[in-house]
């Protein structure tokens, strides 16, 4: 169940070690980098105005039981930052997957799964390709979206 709160004050909302899975999509860009969004809510969502990778992983560490899993998506240029911070908080990166729009394109996102208290071993999985050359979803993306994909491709063309 999604819960909206300030993750920097997560202890005010939840007890420590109360979850076996935590997922996060933290802001991608440090403040004062790239083109900052004009709207305040978009700026907060995209830039590390209110939280950063360290805040996100620290909150996940607090929430996770020993052996619990942490999943996060982020931009490839922040990969080293994310993996370093995960290890700093004893969440060992276990699976890594890059995401690209079409085959043979540079990834625009990565998905990482870590396990609290685990031993080192990172498995890099095949790249997740979103679209076929004709612009339609790949079979794997159709599996991900399921019935939500019905008619979506026609709306974006």
Regions found by a protein language model. Name each.
Residues 1, 18-20:
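Structural signature of beta-strand start/N-cap positions in the alpha/beta core
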Residues 1-12:
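Conserved SAM-binding strand-loop segment of SAM-dependent methyltransferases
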Residues 9, 28, 116:
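Short, glycine/acidic-enriched loop or turn micro-motifs at the edges of active sites
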Residues 11, 32, 80:
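Glycine/Thr-rich phosphate-binding loops of Rossmann-like dinucleotide-binding domains
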Residues 13-17:
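Glycine-rich phosphate-binding loop signature in dinucleotide/nucleotide-binding domains
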Residues 20-21, 26-55:
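Mobile active-site "lid"/loop adjacent to the S-adenosyl-L-methionine
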Residues 49-107, 111:
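Conserved Class I SAM-dependent methyltransferase catalytic core
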Residues 106-157:
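SAM/dcSAM-binding transferase cores
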